[in-house]
Amino acid sequence: MEQYLKVYDALHKINIPYEIVEHPPALTTEEADNYIVGKEGVRTKTLFLTNKKKTAYYLVIMDDAKRLDMEYLAEILNEKRISFGSPERLMKKMGLPPGVVSIFGLLNNDEQDIKVYLDKEMLSERLMSFHANDNTKTIFISTEDMYKFITSIGYEYNIIEL
């Protein structure tokens, strides 16, 4: 099954409405933003991170306009150091290549060993945008439905201030 169809199927099963925008391939949030100009909602970036020993995995979701202070995040996570997960580890854990990471990749994490962190600053917005596990599709869902999606597939999320 195509990756994006898994996303649509999961959203339909839990009655989450969404809007989809199809566009040419976009490997960065900046590229994707060019195709969704004028649409309401936070343009999110989703970062797949790991600790130094590669024994813990994190998905950090934040406004794409914001820069992440990795040292500060490592402190919050009680880790000595964090870094981006390798493309190979990302494929193994989420079934996705770089440039396509979003909360919907959690659908592919059979071990359910990724911890989810949401930046508090963006959560007052009504809508969020994500890749639909395909970099030719941007999906918009409400912030409340984002919470619902995460918990419906068996994950907890943590709200942090970045």
Whereabouts are the PLM-identified features?
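Extended, low-hydrophobicity, polar/charged segments
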Residues: 1-162
